[in-house]
Regions:
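Short pre-catalytic strand/loop immediately N-terminal to key active-site residues, enriched for Gly-Thr
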Residues: 35-43, 80-95
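Short, well-ordered alpha-helical
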Residues: 1-41, 45-46, 66-71, 292
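Acyltransferase
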Residues: 193-210, 230-235, 259-280
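Glycine-rich, small-residue loops and helix-cap segments
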Residues: 165, 171, 260-353
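Structural helix-boundary/capping segments
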Residues: 50, 105-188, 193, 315-353
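Gly/Ser-rich, acidic/histidine-flanked active-site/gating loops
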Residues: 17, 25-26, 153, 169-222, ...
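Short helix-loop capping/hinge segments that flank enzyme active sites or metal/cofactor-binding pockets
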Residues: 14-32, 220-267, 274, 324-331
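Gly/Ser-rich catalytic serine loop of serine hydrolases
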Residues: 88-100, 114, 118-119, 123-124
């Protein structure tokens, strides 16, 4: 299991935490999954790491990831491909694959991940664990290497929803110690599957809606990636892995007009999304549009498919929880600020199982 790349478990009374190697950790090598930063040792920890350590979590080590968090398979040419302990012939997902794998193996009780297009929820779905992307900006990303800043989220991963809730209490001051009783809700469903319909029925009154996808927003994401990497790639591009260099080149090629069109598309996406769930409490979708691909898949061949149901909520900044339900992973989505409601729905869904 070398590809998970987590250090020996640290001693201590606290719960063990795997920290995605995109988060700075004081005095501990932090590579961002790249050879460019192979000797990088930060002086200070990311704010999210510091908050969890202050809450009693013990950093058990750094978890491997797709290089610079730009990929959905955690195939890392420098530090090894992350294996999938739950389904060894399948990808662990990405980019927070090491965090999900460490949980699936039972190495830790909680993990930190980041999510720019699905990078918490996709590996959670692939490895049969739980991942939560909070409302944009709720969990600080200070000290986290950026991918596309207006899409970037940090959040918790755990083996159950209660684990994610416990982590959120450490990550966000004054996050509710207890959630309100869930009760029956009006639940919108889209891109439906049997698991989604069954999950929605367990939560309340079901209504199928047409929800917009966000393919037209992707060039805005790509321009932000280009802005982050432009200077670094010019200086150290020879150290980038081949499977990320190709994507960086594509990002650098996005024109001003393509970017402007994508920004306008993002505004339309937000308007369409808000209209689609008007009058509903929650939205349920599958987490993945397809089964987890084979472990040796070419990442670019599956990237669009694996992010189809996750990326729209990065473009929106809405909270989204991925959790196992039967043989699938379902995604519970709420409006901005409804993080507690989303987690309460997740707890109710787990209880229904």
């Amino acid at each position: 299991m070398d590809g998970i790349w987590i250090t020996e478990l640290a001693p201590g009374e606290g719960r063990r935490l795997a920290v995605k190697d995109l988060f700075d950790t004081a005095g501990i090598r932090t590579t961002y999954g790249s050879a460019v930063f192979s000797d990088h040792v930060p002086a200070a920890s990311a704010e999210a790491v510091a908050r969890l350590e202050a809450a009693g979590w013990v950093n058990a080590g750094k978890a491997n990831l797709h290089e610079f968090a730009y990929g959905v398979t955690s195939q890392n040419l420098h530090y090894g491909t992350v294996p999938n302990p739950a389904h060894p012939d399948r990808t662990a997902g990405g980019s927070s694959g090491g965090s999900a794998a460490a949980l699936a193996l039972g190495l830790v009780e909680g993990a930190l991940g980041t999510d720019t297009g699905g990078s918490i929820r996709i590996p959670a779905a692939c490895c049969d664990v739980v991942g939560f992307k909070p409302t944009f900006g709720l969990v600080p990303i200070d000290g986290v290497f950026p991918l596309a800043p207006s899409f970037d989220h940090a959040g918790p991963m755990a083996r159950d929803v209660l684990g994610c809730l416990t982590l959120m209490r450490g990550l966000v001051p004054d996050f509710a110690a207890e959630l309100d009783s869930f009760g029956s809700r009006r639940v919108a469903v889209t891109w439906t599957s049997d698991a989604v319909l069954a999950a929605a029925a367990a939560l309340g009154e079901i209504h199928e809606v047409a929800f917009p996808t966000a393919e037209d927003v992707v060039p805005a994401f790509m321009r932000e990636v280009a802005d982050v990497h432009r200077e670094l790639y010019d200086e150290s591009g020879d150290l980038y892995g081949e499977n990320i260099s190709e994507k960086i080149e594509r990002c650098l090629a996005v024109t001003d007009s393509e970017y402007a069109e994508a920004v306008a598309a993002r505004d339309r996406h937000r308007e369409g999304a808000e209209a689609a769930i008007d009058g509903f409490d929650l939205l349920l979708t599958p987490t993945l549009a397809t089964a987890p691909p084979p472990a040796d898949v070419v990442e670019l061949d599956v990237r669009a498919e694996l992010t189809r149901f996750t990326f729209p909520f990065n473009a929106l900044g809405w909270p989204a929880l991925a959790l196992p339900f039967g043989q699938e992973s379902v995604q519970i989505v709420g409006r901005p600020g409804d993080d507690r409601l989303v987690l309460a729905a997740g707890l109710a869904l787990e209880a229904a199982l």
